[in-house]
């Protein structure tokens, strides 16, 4: 049943895949993303880790608290969605790499 099954080869492939996944995760964490709301009146910069790096607010919004709150909420929600999508894309790419393991260490 397990004739030709090379467990050490499979283990090596999984180790390589784990290293690649960690590398991809680190690269994504170091990326910066920017989202804007209100035609650019509010801009949020966020890291791939989901940490807010900077918030820019147009001076004209400082006297309109309600509009400022709405635009901040919109920008924050957009930033969260952007990071979630990036994580999903990263996961899909990693799953694609898993599919490339071929015979999973089995010799033909």
UniProtKB/Swiss-Prot annotation:
Task: Name the Gene3D superfamilies on file.
Answer: Nucleoid-associated protein YbaB-like domain
- Give the domain of life: Bacteria
GO molecular-function terms, A-Z? DNA binding
Asked whether the keyword DNA-binding is assigned, the reply is: yes
Gene Ontology CC: one annotated term: cytosol
Keywords of the record? Cytoplasm, DNA-binding
Main localization, broad class: cytoplasm
Which InterPro entries does this chain map to? YbaB-like_sf, YbaB/EbfC
- Subcellular localization(s) per the UniProt record: Cytoplasm, Nucleoid
- SUPFAM superfamilies named in the record: YbaB-like
> Which family does the similarity line name?
Belongs to the YbaB/EbfC family.
Which HAMAP family does the entry link to?
Answer: DNA_YbaB_EbfC (MF_00274)
Quote the function comment for this protein: Binds to DNA and alters its conformation. May be involved in regulation of gene expression, nucleoid organization and DNA protection.
**What is the protein's quaternary organization?**
Homodimer.
Name of the featured protein: Nucleoid-associated protein CHAB381_0200
What lineage does the source organism belong to? Bacteria, Pseudomonadati, Campylobacterota, Epsilonproteobacteria, Campylobacterales
């Amino acid at each position: 049943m397990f004739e030709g099954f090379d467990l050490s080869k499979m283990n090596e492939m999984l180790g390589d895949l784990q290293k690649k996944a960690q590398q991809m995760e680190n690269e994504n964490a170091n990326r910066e993303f920017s989202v804007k709301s209100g035609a650019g009146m509010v801009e949020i910069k966020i890291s791939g880790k989901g940490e807010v790096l900077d918030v820019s607010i147009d001076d004209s919004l400082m006297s309109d608290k309600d509009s400022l709150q709405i635009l901040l909420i919109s920008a924050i929600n957009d930033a969260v969605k952007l990071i979630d999508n990036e994580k999903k894309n990263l996961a899909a790419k990693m799953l694609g790499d898993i599919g490339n393991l071929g015979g999973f260490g089995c010799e033909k």
